[in-house]
Curated annotation (Swiss-Prot):
<feature type="binding site">
    <location>
        <position position="23"/>
    </location>
    <ligand>
        <name>Mg(2+)</name>
    </ligand>
</feature>
<dbReference type="InterPro" id="IPR003607">
    <property type="entry name" value="HD/PDEase_dom"/>
</dbReference>
<feature type="binding site">
    <location>
        <position position="8"/>
    </location>
    <ligand>
        <name>ATP</name>
    </ligand>
</feature>
<keyword id="KW-0378">Hydrolase</keyword>
<feature type="binding site">
    <location>
        <position position="91"/>
    </location>
    <ligand>
        <name>CTP</name>
    </ligand>
</feature>
<dbReference type="InterPro" id="IPR043519">
    <property type="entry name" value="NT_sf"/>
</dbReference>
<dbReference type="InterPro" id="IPR012006">
    <property type="entry name" value="CCA_bact"/>
</dbReference>
<dbReference type="InterPro" id="IPR002646">
    <property type="entry name" value="PolA_pol_head_dom"/>
</dbReference>
<keyword id="KW-0479">Metal-binding</keyword>
<keyword id="KW-0694">RNA-binding</keyword>
<feature type="binding site">
    <location>
        <position position="8"/>
    </location>
    <ligand>
        <name>CTP</name>
    </ligand>
</feature>
<keyword id="KW-0547">Nucleotide-binding</keyword>
<feature type="binding site">
    <location>
        <position position="140"/>
    </location>
    <ligand>
        <name>ATP</name>
    </ligand>
</feature>
<comment type="function">
    <text>Catalyzes the addition and repair of the essential 3'-terminal CCA sequence in tRNAs without using a nucleic acid template. Adds these three nucleotides in the order of C, C, and A to the tRNA nucleotide-73, using CTP and ATP as substrates and producing inorganic pyrophosphate. tRNA 3'-terminal CCA addition is required both for tRNA processing and repair. Also involved in tRNA surveillance by mediating tandem CCA addition to generate a CCACCA at the 3' terminus of unstable tRNAs. While stable tRNAs receive only 3'-terminal CCA, unstable tRNAs are marked with CCACCA and rapidly degraded.</text>
</comment>
<feature type="binding site">
    <location>
        <position position="137"/>
    </location>
    <ligand>
        <name>CTP</name>
    </ligand>
</feature>
<dbReference type="GO" id="GO:0016791">
    <property type="term" value="F:phosphatase activity"/>
</dbReference>
<feature type="binding site">
    <location>
        <position position="140"/>
    </location>
    <ligand>
        <name>CTP</name>
    </ligand>
</feature>
Length: 413
C-alpha cells in the first residue's frame, strides 16, 4: 500500500498558495485493508475513506470509463492493480494531475509542473470531453487563477467549444451549474468565468439572459464601453473589488438584464430597463434554483439601481418609500448591499473605474437618519394601529428632508 497527496493541495503548494483541503490516493490496497486500518468508508459510487484521526479523504486509486451521457455517466474501476499514473490520467487538468509521495517527491506524468510555470490550464487527455461539468470547472479555474495570469490552452478551449456545440452541456443539472457558478462568483475575478463561458459558447446555453446583453449598445456619453455585455462584466469585476459578498456580486451581475429586452429600434436608450429586468432575474433564478435571499436582492437591484444614481434629485418621501420597498426596516443590510451594487454599476465603465460615488454615501446617511426616528415616541404620543405606521413615516420623511437640505440639496432648487 502506497499513499500519495494529490490534486489541488499539490498544485497550490507549488504555486505558493495556502493549502486548504488535502486529498489522498491509496495505491495497492483493498477496501477491507482500509477498514482494517481504521478508516471509515464514505463513498458509495467508488471507495473513499476518512482517516481515523484527520478525517481527510483517502480514495483508492481508480479509473473511469464513459458508460452513459452527462457528467454522471461513468463506470469506476478501483482495485489494487490500478496505478497512480492511471488514476491521475482521469483528472481534468494537468495542473490537477500532480501527486507527492511521503518523501516529498513530485510525481508528474502529464507535465503539470510545466503548465504551472507556463500559467496554462490544459486538459490531461481526450477523456476531458466526456464530462461536460469540466467546461464550467475550467472556467472557474480561469477565474480563480486570473490574478496569476493563467490562461486556457488553445486546444483545451477548442475542445470546450466542441463539447458545447455537441450539446453536452444540456446534460448538466441546474444545481451543478449553480454550484460551479456560486464558487466562481466568490473568486477574485468572477468576470473571467463568464467571459470564458462566452468564449466557448456555453454562456448562450447556460445563461441566455446574460449572453443576450452582448452586442446591445448603450449611449456612449454614459457608457464609453458601449456594449452592455462588456459593461456587465466590468461591473462584476468592480463589485468583486468592493465586496466579498456573494449577494452583492450576483445582484450586480443581474442588474442590467432588462436591457436585453429593449427593441432594437429604441437602441441605445433603455428606458424602464430596471423594472423590465425583474422578470428576467426571476426566470434565471428559478431555472438555476438560486437561493431566495440572493434572488430577492438581485430583483431589488435590477429595479432600483438607476433610482440610486439620481439621489440628489429624489424627494425625501421617495427616499423613505425606497427603504420601505427594499424592506430595510427588517433587512437593514440591504441598504449597504444596494449602495455597493450601484457604485459598481457607475464605476464599471471605461474611464470611470476610479470615480467617486457620493450617492452611496448619501443613501447610507439617509438610512441612518430615517432609522433613528424612535417608534417608542410615536406610541407614547397616543397613536394606535395603522396610525403608528403613518405617523412614523411622516416623521421619517421630515427627518430625511432636514438632513437632505444640509447634506444633499436638490441641485434644481
Amino acid at each position: 500500500m502506497k499513499i500519495y497527496l494529490v490534486g489541488g493541495a499539490v498544485r497550490d503548494a507549488l504555486l505558493g498558495l495556502p493549502v486548504k483541503d488535502k486529498d489522498w490516493v491509496v495505491v495497492g490496497a483493498t477496501p477491507q485493508e482500509m477498514l482494517d486500518a481504521g478508516y471509515q468508508q464514505v463513498g458509495r459510487d467508488f471507495p473513499v475513506f476518512l482517516h481515523p484521526q484527520t478525517h481527510e479523504e483517502y480514495a483508492l486509486a481508480r479509473t473511469e470509463r464513459k458508460s452513459g451521457s452527462g457528467y454522471t455517466g461513468f463506470t469506476c474501476y478501483a482495485a489494487p492493480d490500478v496505478t497512480l499514473e492511471a488514476d491521475l490520467q482521469r483528472r481534468d487538468l494537468t495542473i490537477n494531475a500532480l501527486a507527492r509521495d511521503d518523501d516529498g517527491q513530485i510525481i508528474d506524468p502529464y507535465h503539470g509542473r510545466r503548465d504551472l510555470e507556463a500559467r496554462l490550464l490544459r486538459h490531461v487527455s481526450p477523456a476531458f470531453g466526456e464530462d461536460p461539468l469540466r467546461v464550467l470547472r475550467v472556467a472557474r479555474f480561469a477565474a480563480r487563477y486570473a490574478h496569476l495570469s493563467f490562461r486556457i490552452a488553445d486546444e483545451t478551449l477548442a475542445l470546450m467549444r466542441e463539447m458545447t456545440a455537441a450539446g453536452e452541456l444540456e446534460h448538466l443539472t441546474q444545481e451543478r451549474v449553480w454550484k460551479e457558478t456560486e464558487n466562481a462568483l466568490t473568486t477574485r475575478n468572477p468576470q473571467v468565468y463568464f467571459q470564458v463561458l462566452r468564449d466557448c459558447g456555453a454562456l448562450r446555453v447556460l445563461f441566455p439572459e446574460i449572453d443576450a446583453l452582448f452586442g446591445v449598445p448603450a449611449p456612449a456619453k454614459w457608457h464609453p464601453e458601449i456594449d452592455t455585455g462588456v459593461h456587465t462584466l466590468m461591473t462584476l469585476s468592480m463589485a468583486a473589488m468592493l465586496s466579498p459578498q456573494l449577494d452583492v456580486r450576483f445582484a450586480t451581475l443581474c442588474h442590467d438584464l432588462g436591457k436585453g429586452l429593449t427593441p432594437k429600434n429604441l437602441w441605445p436608450r433603455h428606458h424602464g430597463h430596471g423594472p423590465a429586468g425583474v422578470k428576467l432575474v426571476e426566470q434565471l433564478c428559478q431555472r438555476l434554483r438560486v437561493p431566495n435571499d440572493l434572488r430577492d436582492l438581485a430583483k431589488l437591484v435590477a429595479e432600483y439601481h438607476d433610482l440610486i444614481h439620481t439621489f440628489p434629485i429624489l424627494q425625501p418621501k421617495t427616499i423613505v418609500k425606497l427603504f420601505d420597498a427594499i424592506d430595510a426596516w427588517r433587512k437593514p443590510q440591504r441598504v449597504e448591499q444596494i449602495a455597493l451594487t450601484s457604485e459598481a454599476d457607475v464605476r464599471g465603465r471605461t474611464g470611470f473605474e476610479a470615480s467617486d460615488y457620493p450617492q452611496g454615501r448619501w443613501l447610507r446617511e439617509a438610512w441612518q437618519v430615517a432609522q433613528a426616528v424612535p417608534t417608542k415616541e410615536v406610541v407614547e404620543a397616543g397613536f394606535k394601529g395603522i396610525e403608528i405606521r403613518e405617523e412614523l413615516t411622516k416623521r421619517r420623511i421630515a427627518a430625511v428632508a432636514s438632513w437632505k437640505e444640509k447634506r444633499c440639496p436638490n441641485p434644481a432648487n
